[in-house]
Amino acid sequence: MIGFTLGTGVGGVIAIDGHIYQGRDGTGGEMGHQTLDPEGPTCGCGNRGCLEAYARADRIAEACGTKSVEEAIERARAGDPRARAGLERVGRYLGVGIANMITTITPQRVVLGGGVAASADLLLDTIRDEVRRHVFTTSLEGVEIVTAELGTWAGAIGAAIHGAERADAAGAAARQGRTPAVPA
């Protein structure tokens, strides 16, 4: 499973057999910082063209000509052409980022959570179209792209579970007299 948390940034998680993949140094899952365009806008991380530079909340508002992502969603639902075009553009970038991850990992499910996921009714068709455009058909078989059942709380709950797993691993290691192999 791959999860994207869409809000003030673009967070991510990779879960394999029910466990969060952490990578070598605990940073596995930084999908928001995959480069989509090396000449693109500067991201908060200093890189250029990251998915997050296109799909974080303030950039969505900017693309839609609004002060907030909530206003952008409201206007798009009311039929505002600029807001609809801005969200469609964001959906295309999200679709490309998700396609990259599907091509790399071939998960069974991609879950979209966070505040921006509240606009899923405006984004999902575009995201799915982009994914189909950029992923081999065989890699797409059986892949679901869905919104998080936990909605805007998905990222916070996932972080809490991750923290609990790390604490449990550290406690088990300490009970065995070992230093935990979990990044700080």
Task: For each feature predicted by the language model, list its residue ranges.
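Short glycine-aspartate micro-motif
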Residues: 1-5, 11-13, 42-44
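Short glycine-rich anion-binding loops that position phosphate/pyrophosphate groups of nucleotides
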Residues: 7-9, 116-117
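ATP-binding/phosphotransfer module of carbohydrate and carboxylate kinases, centering on a glycine-rich
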Residues: 15, 20, 35-184
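A short acidic/small-residue loop/turn micro-motif
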Residues: 27-30
